[in-house]
Amino acid sequence: MLSNNIIRQQLIHYGITDCCELIYNPSFEQLVREETNHNLTNLERGTITNSGAIAVNTGIFTGRSPLDKYIVCDNDTHHQLWWSDQDKTSNNQPISQITWQYLKKLVSKQLSYKRLFIIDVYCGAKKNSRLRVRFVTEVAWQAHFVKNMFIQPDAIDLISFEPEFIVLNGAKCTNPNWREQNMHSENFIALNLTEGMQLIAGTWYGGEMKKGLFTVMNYHLPLKGIASMHCSANVGINKDVALFFGLSGTGKTTLSHDTNRALIGDDEHGWDNDGIFNLEGGCYAKTINLKPELEPEIFQAIRCNALLENVMVRADGSVNYHDNSKTDNARVSYPLNHIKNRVQPVSCASHASTIIFLTADAFGVLPPVATLTNEQAQYYFLSGFSAKLSGTERGIISPVPTFSACFGAAFLALHPTVYAALLAKRMNIAGTNAYLVNTGWNGNGSRIALKDTKAIINAILNKQIQDTPTIKLPIFNLSIPQILIGVDSNILDPRTSYINSSEWQNKARSLAQLFIKNFNKFTLPLTCKKLHNAGPQL
């Protein structure tokens, strides 16, 4: 283990001086004592729930702040990155080196003269591509989050651990000069990919630490020819690997936690010449409306060492997972070893045989499942479509479409077509089959039942879907099965959920126009005419 003197010298290099005490890679037991200390107040203090998990609040920041994300634009990144001033769907807002230095001084000043938690971890399960990362924070539960979410080095590795990337979390400080610097607010998440550092200020949301590193890996891995993906992954007893892509709320985590399949990871993965590997060492699952009978793997993972965010804790220490008074984005982080059926000892597996693109369509247009051609797979990957309701929960009143390239535009460092090309290459080599699965709503305003979605996933993974007759869905030209075991055949064709089929036709045309408008921005060689033709046609 590194000595305190060495770490203090390294902190000085980051601009952090005169630390009162350093707590280096503490155990979970020590972190629990620290984060539940009665002398702590407000957002620093955690509560022990009756499951043994710690519950914390993140204040007004119950989700990511994409408008407060910045990356230093320098000679190395200027021509490589997908910048927001070139495409408004990118969250990569450029800042100058001068602004960066100012922000760095703010955060380093905040962390100076403090008791600090130093956590050294790996991002990436593959030794030849993993990143050595150091997190520095003054908040115990933030250190707990990091320990849950990333891969822990062993004692031997820690003796000579040399971080390649530094994360300074100064959640307690803000930027008083944000207006003069043309920034969105006093809060910021800033990355310097050349220097190898991330700064966090103003926001307490734990996910900023996790997703900041994902952006970093989305920069480094593709430049090495490795596909980086916002997806969950699991593997069957026959070593068949499935990837689940999808935006938040589409079921990515829920559907990949399967008692019959070993979990590789729930959110971030790479795909190299050897196969699939996890970038993380933990899971970050939504807990709203969590029920043990529907999501038993996640429910049983909430125990000692798990960290709950923004849940409602009752006086007796129990948690009300149905209370969304704080946020619909209540979450829990826990280490992968909380999942009994997981890939061991490292989160790696062979090449993917199946890819499932999850969408939660609130328009009532898309089918519960469709088989995709190679071109359609690239089209829907680049589109990254989902939708949510701005009206009531029941009934499709005012769908809000979301197009997030590669099902993770907020985390991409390079242009989306770079990731699409790498994924297409890996799929072609491995002979991967792709499917579109809609976990959203049908024409009568009912959400597709989880039991039906799970039966659809089973039909895909056991290859039953490959032997069933199909029909073509007009406008979108999607191949949909006519029958699947365990699934009500009446829901497979979305048109049957409408009393008047012309109503589906009208909604389908409206949604198709949105797809076409969104995809028109992709004009590079990869997205040639055949990819445009793979989408809906009017």
Swiss-Prot record:
Gene3D superfamilies in UniProt = 3.90.228.20, Phosphoenolpyruvate Carboxykinase, domain 1, Phosphoenolpyruvate Carboxykinase, domain 2
Query: What EC number(s) is this enzyme filed under?
Result: 4.1.1.49
A GO biological process held by the record: gluconeogenesis
Q: Which residues bind substrate?
A: R64, Y205, K211, R331
Q: Please verify whether the record's keywords include Metal-binding.
A: yes
**Which residues are involved in binding Mn(2+)?**
K211, H230, D267
The places in or outside the cell where this protein is found are:
Cytoplasm
Q: Would the keyword Cell cycle turn up in this protein's UniProt record?
A: no
Oligomeric form and interacting partners: Monomer.
The pathway entry for this protein reads as:
Carbohydrate biosynthesis; gluconeogenesis
Task: Supply the PANTHER family for this chain.
Answer: PHOSPHOENOLPYRUVATE CARBOXYKINASE (ATP), PHOSPHOENOLPYRUVATE CARBOXYKINASE ATP
- Quote the InterPro entries the UniProt record gives: PEP_carboxykinase_ATP (IPR001272), PEP_carboxykinase_C (IPR013035), PEP_carboxykinase_N (IPR008210), PEPCK_ATP_CS (IPR015994)
Its transmembrane ranges are none
Q: How is the cofactor bound?
A: Binds 1 Mn(2+) ion per subunit.
Q: Which GO terms describe its cellular component?
A: cytosol
Query: What is catalysed by this protein?
Result: oxaloacetate + ATP = phosphoenolpyruvate + ADP + CO2
**Annotated family:** Belongs to the phosphoenolpyruvate carboxykinase (ATP) family.
The coiled-coil regions, if any, are none
Q: Which cofactor does it need?
A: Mn(2+)
- Gene name per UniProt: pckA
Function comment: Involved in the gluconeogenesis. Catalyzes the conversion of oxaloacetate (OAA) to phosphoenolpyruvate (PEP) through direct phosphoryl transfer between the nucleoside triphosphate and OAA.
Positions of ATP binding: 211, 230, 246-254, 295, 331, 447-448, 453
Checking PROSITE patterns in the record gives: PEPCK_ATP (PS00532)
Q: What is this protein called?
A: Phosphoenolpyruvate carboxykinase (ATP)
